[in-house]
Each structure stands twice: as C-alpha cells, then as structure tokens.
Amino acid sequence: MLDRLKSIEERYEKLNEYLSDPEVVNDPTKLREYSKEQSDIQETVEVYRQYRAAYDQLSEAKAMLEDKLDAEMRDMVKEEISELTEETERLEDELKILLIPKDPNDNKNVIVEVRGAAGGEEAALFAGNLYRMYSRYAEMQGWKTEVMEASVTGTGGYKEIIFMISGKGAYSKLKFENGAHRVQRVPETESGGRIHTSTATVAVLPEAEEVEIDIHEKDIRVDTFTSSGPGGQSVNTTMSAVRLTHLPTGVVVSCQDEKSQIKNKEKAMKVLRARIYDKFQREAQAEYDQTRKSAVGTGDRSERIRTYNFPQNRVTDHRIGLTIQKLDQILEGKLDEVIDALIMEDQARKLQNAK
C-alpha cells in the first residue's frame, strides 16, 4: 500500500509541474485533464502526508523509550505513543478507503427522474414529496436544481418530473437513490382512515459530457408540438414543445417546460445524452458481470429500496436494514444520515472485495 501511495504522491507533484507549464496552461483540453486528475488524488496525497508525519512522530516517541527516562517522563512518552498509534491507525483506515477505485461519475451533475408508480393519484403526490425532498437536500449542499420536464396531475402531484442537480459530488451522494420508494399513509381523501401503500420510482443518471458520448444529429428525429398543461389543456399556441428520438437506441425524450423551443431542445438533449450514456453503462456492466449485483446502489429500478411510513414517522432503507424515526426531517431534505450510512456500507463492501 505504501509503495502505491508513494507513486500517487510522485504523480501529484508531476501534475503540479505540468499545471505550471505555459504550454499546458494554453491548452484547454490538457489543462482540464490534468486539473481533474490532480483534484482526484489531492485528498489521498494530503492524508498520506499526515499519515507519514504521524508515523515518523510515533517512531521517534518509541525510540525515546530506549533512553533513560524518569518515571513521569516515561508515562508522558507512553501516553504520546498511545495517541499516535491511534492516529496512524485511523489515517491508515482512511487511506484504505481513499485507495478504493472511484466511480468515474462521482463528481458529475445528475439528472433525476421521479415517476408516480403504483397507487394512482397518491403515488403522484408522493412523487412530488420526493422531488421536494431532493430539492431541499440539494439546497443544503449548495447545489443548483433545475426542472427539465414535468407532468403535473390535477391535485398537484407528478406523473413524472425530471430535474437536474448541479454540484460537485452530486452523483456520489444521490446514486444510491435509484429504485422504488414506497409510501404508507392515510390519503387526505380517505374518510375511513385506512393506510394506503403507493410507490414512486427514482432514476439517477450522471450527466454525460459531449466528449464522453458521440451523438450524431442525423440519428435524432426532432418532433415539435404545442405545450399542454394539467388535464391536457393547451397552454401555448406555438410549437414550443420538443420530442427527441434517438433512432439507433429508441430512447425518447420530451420537454415542454420552457416557452422557447430552443431552450426545450437544449434541455431535452441533456436528458437524452444522460439516458443514452446510462443505457450504454448498464449494458457494459451487465456484460461484465451478469450474475453479481451489489446490495447498495444497483440501479435496479424495480427494487423496493426504501419505505416511508407516515403514521409512525419512520423511514426504513431495506438494503442496509436502517430504520430512522425522523420521516418529517428527511422529507425536509435532511438526508445525510441515510446517505452517509449507504456510503459507509458501500465502502465496507468494496474494502472486503479488495482483500
């Protein structure tokens, strides 16, 4: 492990040299490439240097015990050794996690698709709850949320809402939200007070950059139509709504959120690119390993990953057996406790697999 860390540090120093080179500074492609690589390994290098400093201090403290010391001084050195041993062990564990191969999509923006599933109008209302939850969470992280497309129901729920969350590390946190989310509550229209169960599905796609996936204009069919509001009534007499069909894959995306056809097409292209990128990634993963599916973040949209029980103010994540009696807070966007637990479980599994 130490040899690997040393080579990472050497690479980091080499990248510093590159980024000071005028030839690189004047080449946007190289500058972006080297800056990203440096950013990806910076934390590992910083923790490695902390570890090395603590290890050197520990060695010096142990050497002091070889000298003739009075009882008080010996006790002080032993206490320092105990503290430094604990510190080096903590940093070593942190380095093991940092050396786990990273998901190349982790720092990307995400496109989130939330759809009401089983449960009719109640499922659509729950889809609205989830959209609000993710919007609040994004706001707390300092990220930006932008609605790409929404299909609103008569009661204010969503048959479907697609939105982008932009911010560093968005995919690393939100990728675990892929799957079916179940809600248990008494609908406002239920006079008998019976608890109903409904579901909404969530798909989290990393935003695909143009350099990562090549989409040719000739492969896209563009259809335009008039925008419509809840219930199908026309809200725009111009042909501003856009439907894009990627002919080779059959992926279809519609957007009518903006009044401008150009803006709708731009938004639709972002979603189309992300969906095609996600499709290729999932196909490649399935080909790589058809039988193995991780317990966390598999991306299986039919999987029931979490239950939101309103009468008991309870949220249960079924993948890791986590139950929290803070449903009200979680729906306000306070998702850290759930997401952090999922990340820790994912890291532990990867560490185990790496042994």
From Swiss-Prot:
Protein localization: Cytoplasm
InterPro entries: PCRF, Pep_chain_release_fac_I, Pep_chain_release_fac_I_sf, Prokaryotic/Mito_RF, RF-1
This protein's UniProt keywords: Cytoplasm, Methylation, Protein biosynthesis
GO function terms (MF aspect): translation release factor activity, codon specific
Domain of life: Bacteria
Processing after translation: Methylated by PrmC. Methylation increases the termination efficiency of RF1.
GO cellular component, one term: cytoplasm
Sequence similarity: Belongs to the prokaryotic/mitochondrial release factor family.
Name of this protein: Peptide chain release factor 1
